[in-house]
């Protein structure tokens, strides 16, 4: 495939650019991960599904991708929550990491190439801070905390397109007496009694949030890498501060391209615990199948806001079922690919090569689904070839990962075990020649949208 014509929006330049990796056919990508003080919410799902689609597409296009997604496992929020729960930070972190991995797996998010924890990279953070101090970009305050000297970095604000002087005038940053400037940010924080701490030249403490990502990306991807990704809420100050630290320390460009995913709104309002419209991924998955949630979150262009609402999720559910129904009762066979199948794949590539335009890519999938449905009764050979292509392109987006019949069995709140019990009762009723009861059970299930199919080997069921 042609590597030359992929374009996407670079937050650093503020415009779409042709993608040119540092090393031919290879991509080094860093995505800011979760601070594991609580359960992952729907905003996390949005971000990591967006970048999972991009990761999958890069691989589909033939790139060798190294994706680093970190875990922030030491932070003020983690310490505060552990104290509130009466548990150690280790207990809190390990439980939340397991929960994160569980929900990400349910949403079919691929594991990153590497998943470093902040606490595993302390020596590298200390080394970076020492370099910044030597170069005059950092200083130790009166209370021994170490701060980054923002005014020393001439390009501060280049990612967020903000002027440092204007930021200082409108600053709402809490005034800390030992700071030279209100915009200076902490690189190393001295530990209070009872808090987790690591030795450093400045005393026992822990790293600031921003230096963690700079050190982890440097360790695993080098001084300069291709793509840095994260939620749009991290653009300032987190990503701006990462650039300031890394470029001052390494004296070279930090990341060539910056991708930012759009935020989730709930019924057109900002998602917030105070507005009581905050949903964890687990809560959403209690109501909707992972296929539906993933489709919904992948169906909007990655950098646009997305509105979480029951109506939009129901629309996503209907769309998923349309795609699954097209693949029902047809075996995908690669060798049966029709000659004109390449036209569909080319349209899919054209959409995704243009800033990962998933809505346009999905439109291609629905055109394929329509073609399959038309051919099912007239040319199953050709339909099976199109079905193979539909499966292939769905895999690129990470959708339709569930067995078709298993998906339909889980729909509309139908309890599979209860259905199986009723089928067993119906089978026994037929053996006893109690056909009235057998018909009652069939009708009962039919009202729930469950279709029974009898054969010589027994009875199977599916959601209609």
UniProtKB/Swiss-Prot annotation:
HAMAP family the UniProt entry points to: Cys_tRNA_synth
Gene Ontology MF terms: ATP binding; cysteine-tRNA ligase activity; zinc ion binding
Signal peptide bounds: none
Extent of motif 'HIGH' region: 34-44
Principal subcellular localisation of the protein: cytoplasm
Assembly mode: Monomer.
Protein name stated in the entry: Cysteine--tRNA ligase
Motif segment ('KMSKS' region): 270-274
EC number per UniProt: 6.1.1.16
Upper classification of the organism: Bacteria, Pseudomonadati, Pseudomonadota, Gammaproteobacteria, Thiotrichales
GO terms under cellular component: cytosol
UniProt entry tagged with the keyword Secreted: no
Transmembrane segments: none
Cofactor(s) demanded: Zn(2+)
Family statement drawn from the similarity comment of this UniProt entry: Belongs to the class-I aminoacyl-tRNA synthetase family.
């Amino acid at each position: 495939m042609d590597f030359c014509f992929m374009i996407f929006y670079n937050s650093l330049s503020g415009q779409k650019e042709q993608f040119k990796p540092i090393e031919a056919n290879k991509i080094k990508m860093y995505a800011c991960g979760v601070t594991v003080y609580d359960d992952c919410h729907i905003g996390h799902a949005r971000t990591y599904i967006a970048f999972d689609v991009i990761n999958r597409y890069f691989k589909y296009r033939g790139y060798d991708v190294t994706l680093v997604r970190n875990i922030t496992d030491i932070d003020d929020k983690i310490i505060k929550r552990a104290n509130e729960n009466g548990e150690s930070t280790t207990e809190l972190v390990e439980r939340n990491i397991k929960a994160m991995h569980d929900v990400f797996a349910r949403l079919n998010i691929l594991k990153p190439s590497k998943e470093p924890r902040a606490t595993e990279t302390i020596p590298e953070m200390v080394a970076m801070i020492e370099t910044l101090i030597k170069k005059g970009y950092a200083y130790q305050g009166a209370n021994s905390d170490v701060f980054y000297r923002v005014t020393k970095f001439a390009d501060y604000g280049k990612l967020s397109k903000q002027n440092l002087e204007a930021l200082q005038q409108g600053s709402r940053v809490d005034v800390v007496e030992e700071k030279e400037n209100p915009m200076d940010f902490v690189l190393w924080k001295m530990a209070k009694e009872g808090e987790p701490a690591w030795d450093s030249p400045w005393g026992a403490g822990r790293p600031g949030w921003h230096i963690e990502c700079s050190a982890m990306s440097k360790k695993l991807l080098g001084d300069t890498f291709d793509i840095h990704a994260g939620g749009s809420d991290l653009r300032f100050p987190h990503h701006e501060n990462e650039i300031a630290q890394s470029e001052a320390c390494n004296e070279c460009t930090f990341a060539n391209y910056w991708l930012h995913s759009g935020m989730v709104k709930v019924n057109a309002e900002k998602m917030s615990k105070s507005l009581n419209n905050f949903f964890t991924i687990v809560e959403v998955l209690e109501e909707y199948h992972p296929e539906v949630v993933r489709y919904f979150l992948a169906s909007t262009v990655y950098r646009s806001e997305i509105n979480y609402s029951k109506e939009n999720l129901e629309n996503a559910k209907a769309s998923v079922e349309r795609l699954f129904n097209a693949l029902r009762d047809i075996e995908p066979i690669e060798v049966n690919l029709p000659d004109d199948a390449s036209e569909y794949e080319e349209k899919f590539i054209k959409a995704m090569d243009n800033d990962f335009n998933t809505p346009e890519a999905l439109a291609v999938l629905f055109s394929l689904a329509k073609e399959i449905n038309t051919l099912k009764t007239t040319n199953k050979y050709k339909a099976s070839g199109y079905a193979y292509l539909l499966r292939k392109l769905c895999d690129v987006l990470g959708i339709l990962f569930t067995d078709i019949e298993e998906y339909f069995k889980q729909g509309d709140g139908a309890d599979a075990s209860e259905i199986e019990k009723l089928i067993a009762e119906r089978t026994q009723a037929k053996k006893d020649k109690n056909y009235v009861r057998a018909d009652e059970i069939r009708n009962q299930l039919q009202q729930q949208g469950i279709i029974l199919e009898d054969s010589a080997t027994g009875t199977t069921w599916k959601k209609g």
